[in-house]
Amino acid sequence: MSPISTLFMHRYTPLTEFYLAGFWQVVTPDQMRQRPHPRLNSIAWVMWHIARVEDAGLNRFVMQQPQVLDSADWTVQMNLPWRNHGGEMTLAEVDELSARIDLDGLHRYMQAVQTRTRAIVATLDETVLAQPLEHAFVQQVVVDEGLVLRNAAG
C-alpha cells in the first residue's frame, strides 16, 4: 500500500468502523429520520449524502468505473427515486428522503460503498491521483449521469 493509501486508511478506518458504525447501534430509526432543527438535515440524509459523494467521487472521478449505486439496484433497495448526491435538495425533499428511505437498505449501501472504497484505496498511488479529468467527462458524470440535478449544475 502506498504512503497516501496508508494515510487515508488511518483516517478512514476509525471514521467508518467506529463513528459511522456506532450510529447504527445507538441511534433509533426515529432519531435517524428527524431533523434536529428546521434548517438542519436528518442523520439519514447526512449518511446517504456521505455515501453518495464517496461512491461517485472514488468510482467515477478517480477510477472512472461504475458506481456501487448502479451495481445492485440500490435506489430500489433504499426506496429512493434520486441518484444525485442531494446537495441541491430543497428542505421539502430532505423531509421526503428522510421519511421514505429504507434504513436497512441505506446501511447496506454504505457498507458496500465502504468495501469498494477500501479496495480502491489499496490500489492508489500518486500517479492515479495526478491524472487530470477532462471537462467532458466531468460534465457526463455530473449532469448526464445525474450526480447533480440539471438546475443545480448551471
Annotate each predicted stretch with a short phrase.
Residues 1-47, 52-154:
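Aromatic-glycine hotspot motif
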